[in-house]
Structures are given as C-alpha cells and as structure tokens.
C-alpha cells in the first residue's frame, strides 16, 4: 500500500527554520532517520521509503505554501495513491507550541496551504497532522510570527516534538487514522 506524506512549507533558506516550515522539518528528520534522500522532481522534493509492507512517499512541495495543492494532487495521481492515504504535516496557530493533533477532516482554519489543498482536491476529507506553533503575537502580526524562527525556548523542545510527530506518521501508515488518533490525540 502507498502513502503520500506531504509537509507544508516554503522553499528557500530564508524560510528554512521558520514556524511555517515545521512540515518540512518533520520530513527532513524522518528522511534522516530512514537514511533516505530527497530528490528534486516535478512540483517538489520527493523521497520514498519502505515501512514494513508500506511504501511512503515524502513530499516537500516547491510551489510555496499557497499552491501546495497542485503538488499534492500531482503526486497522488502520479503514484496512484488514494486520498485516504494522504497525510499533510502542517503548522497550527490554534494549538499551543508542540501540541500534536491528527484529524481526518475539517476546515482550513485560515491556513492558506490547507485552503489551496481543499480547493485543489475539492474536499475537506483528508488527513492532517497539526503541529502547534502557538499564537504568542500581537494583533496584526500573524504573518511575521509564522515566518519567524522558533524561539530559543521552543528550540529546546523542538526535536523531541518532531520525534513524536514521526511516531504519529509511522502509526498512521501502519495502523490507520482511528487507532492513531486514539493513541496520540490526548
């Protein structure tokens, strides 16, 4: 069985360590732990790995956040992957820093990457792992906040939370969304 795990983020060194790029960070850590390397392909950087009898395609779209749906649709079609085997890794302002929540459907929550995915796939029924980045910013400064790097205090806990996100990805692919939500959404 095939899975597409897509991390949302923006390409370029300028954004590499920003809160908005947590999806890319999780995929980079997952690729490193699995000893696989990303290759630049159509619509993004892609890596693949075997997890027991599953084939995981890891995608970092090169379309920038607001057009992520194009890359995701392309790779779903190219690899003939069912949408229920799609998992989006995304930052979430409404969750405290480091909180992790798996959802099988829902609104875009104001996230432009999710908006584009829902528009492009024509559905809100797809899996997403929401990584809390908090909302510790003054009114009107949301864009600066998500594009800023994590604070020193947040960085102390970042690798541990990324490791937990990887556990959730593995569980999703091996056990499915319901079991994974029951195990990790606490």
UniProtKB/Swiss-Prot annotation:
The record marks 91 as: Stabilizes the basic form of H active site to accept a proton. The record marks 10 as: Discriminates between blocked and unblocked aminoacyl-tRNA. GO terms for biological process: protein quality control for misfolded or incompletely synthesized proteins; rescue of stalled ribosome. Hydrolyzes ribosome-free peptidyl-tRNAs (with 1 or more amino acids incorporated), which drop off the ribosome during protein synthesis, or as a result of ribosome stalling. Catalyzes the release of premature peptidyl moieties from peptidyl-tRNA molecules trapped in stalled 50S ribosomal subunits, and thus maintains levels of free tRNAs and 50S ribosomes. Gene3D superfamilies: Peptidyl-tRNA hydrolase. The active site is at residue 20. Coiled coil: none annotated. Its EC number is 3.1.1.29. TRNA binds at residues 15, 64, 66, 112. CDD domains: PTH. The keyword Cytoplasm applies. Keywords: Cytoplasm, Hydrolase, RNA-binding, tRNA-binding. GO terms for cellular component: cytoplasm. It catalyses: an N-acyl-L-alpha-aminoacyl-tRNA + H2O = an N-acyl-L-amino acid + a tRNA + H(+). Monomer. GO terms for molecular function: peptidyl-tRNA hydrolase activity; tRNA binding. It is found in: Cytoplasm. Its main location: cytoplasm. Belongs to the PTH family. This is Peptidyl-tRNA hydrolase.
């Amino acid at each position: 069985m095939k899975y597409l795990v897509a991390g949302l983020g923006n390409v370029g060194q300028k954004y590499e360590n920003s809160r908005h790029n947590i999806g890319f960070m999780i995929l980079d850590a997952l690729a490193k732990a699995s000893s696989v390397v990303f290759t630049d392909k159509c619509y993004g950087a892609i890596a693949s790995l075997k997890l027991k009898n599953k084939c995981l395609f890891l995608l970092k779209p090169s379309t920038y956040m607001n057009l992520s749906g194009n890359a995701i649709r392309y790779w779903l079609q190219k690899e003939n992957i069912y949408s229920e085997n799609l998992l989006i890794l995304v930052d979430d302002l409404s969750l405290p820093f480091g909180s992790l929540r798996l959802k099988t459907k829902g609104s875009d929550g104001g996230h432009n990457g999710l908006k584009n995915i829902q528009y492009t796939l024509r559905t809100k029924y797809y899996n997403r792992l929401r990584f809390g980045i908090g909302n510790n910013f003054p009114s009107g400064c949301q864009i600066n906040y998500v594009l800023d790097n994590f604070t020193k205090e947040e960085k102390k806990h970042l690798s541990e939370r990324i490791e937990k996100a990887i556990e959730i990805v593995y569980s999703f692919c091996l056990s499915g969304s319901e079991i994974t939500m029951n195990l990790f959404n606490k």
